[in-house]
């Protein structure tokens, strides 16, 4: 099991925090454990409430069913089903940016 540094950023919500996240823990769950309040709804990768955008690093979100190829290609990720695969930076609170 690897542990990665995940940096979560939202200027609008005054978030700029780096957390430790194991490669078998969803980013949303690790953020909650660290006391960071991120938006979520379904927790199953089937909506866009928890959307973020990866600006650096690699994420495994193979369990998601909502985002299309273009959105994923642009770096969008659903934090509720996203596992880190490297140290990474994620802009959070990005649901409005999807559309």
Curated annotation (Swiss-Prot):
Cofactor binding note of this UniProt entry: Binds 1 [2Fe-2S] cluster.
Locations listed in the record: Plastid, Chloroplast
UniProt keyword Transit peptide, yes or no: no
Gene3D superfamilies documented for this protein: 3.10.20.30
Cofactor requirement: [2Fe-2S] cluster
Residues that coordinate or bind [2Fe-2S] cluster: 42, 47, 50, 80
Biological-process GO terms, alphabetical: electron transport chain
Membrane spanning stretches: none
Gene Ontology cellular-component terms listed: chloroplast
SUPFAM superfamilies associated with the record: 2Fe-2S ferredoxin-like (SSF54292)
Residue ranges annotated for the 2Fe-2S ferredoxin-type domain, each copy included: 4-96
Homology family: Belongs to the 2Fe2S plant-type ferredoxin family.
Record's function text: Ferredoxins are iron-sulfur proteins that transfer electrons in a wide variety of metabolic reactions.
Subunit structure: Forms a complex with heterodimeric ferredoxin-thioredoxin reductase (FTR) and thioredoxin.
Protein name stated in the entry: Ferredoxin
Native source species: Thalassiosira weissflogii (Marine diatom)
